[in-house]
Amino acid sequence: MFDLGWSELLVIGVVALIVVGPKDLPVLFRNVGRWVGKARGLAREFSRAMNDAADEAGVKDISKGLKAATNPVDAALDGVRKAATDFKTDLDPTKYNPDSETGKLAAERAEQAKKIQAATARVAAERRLREATAELEKAKDAEAALKPGPET
C-alpha cells in the first residue's frame, strides 16, 4: 500500500523509538495500526460501492460486448463452428425424404459408408493380429534363447 521495504520500516521504528520513547511506543504502534485498518476498510468500502454502481449501470455487460466485438478471432471461430455444425447436419441421410431421388442417393451413400467403415475395421483388426503374431513369435524365440540346454 505504501510501498515500504524492511529497511524503511526499520528506520521509521528507530526514529519512533527515539522520538516517542520505549514506554509509549506500543501505544503509538497500536494507534497507527488501528488508523491503517480503518483506512483500508474505507478504501475497501469505497471500491465495493464503485463496483456495485458500475454493475447497476451495466458496465460489465458493455465491457463484455466490447471485448466480444473487438476480438475477431473468437468471432471467426464462432462462424467456423456454426458452418461445421451446419455441414454435419446437411450430410445427415435421415434428413431427406426416402422417396425422393436425393433420399435414395443419400441412403445408398450411407450404406456405402458403413461398408467402407466395416472393411477398414476388418483390415485394421487383421493388421493388429499379424503384428501380435509376429510379437508372439519374437517372444517365443527370446524364451527359447534363455532356456539352458540339457546338461550332460
Curated annotation (Swiss-Prot):
It is a single-pass membrane protein. InterPro entries: TatA/B/E, TatB. It comes from the Bacteria. GO terms for cellular component: TAT protein transport complex. It is found in: Cell inner membrane. GO terms for biological process: protein transport by the Tat complex. The chain crosses the membrane at residues 1-21. Keywords: Cell inner membrane, Cell membrane, Membrane, Protein transport, Translocation, Transmembrane, Transmembrane helix, Transport. GO terms for molecular function: protein transmembrane transporter activity. Belongs to the TatB family. Part of the twin-arginine translocation (Tat) system that transports large folded proteins containing a characteristic twin-arginine motif in their signal peptide across membranes. Together with TatC, TatB is part of a receptor directly interacting with Tat signal peptides. TatB may form an oligomeric binding site that transiently accommodates folded Tat precursor proteins before their translocation. The Tat system comprises two distinct complexes: a TatABC complex, containing multiple copies of TatA, TatB and TatC subunits, and a separate TatA complex, containing only TatA subunits. Substrates initially bind to the TatABC complex, which probably triggers association of the separate TatA complex to form the active translocon. This is Sec-independent protein translocase protein TatB. The lineage of its organism: Bacteria, Pseudomonadati, Pseudomonadota, Alphaproteobacteria, Rhodobacterales.
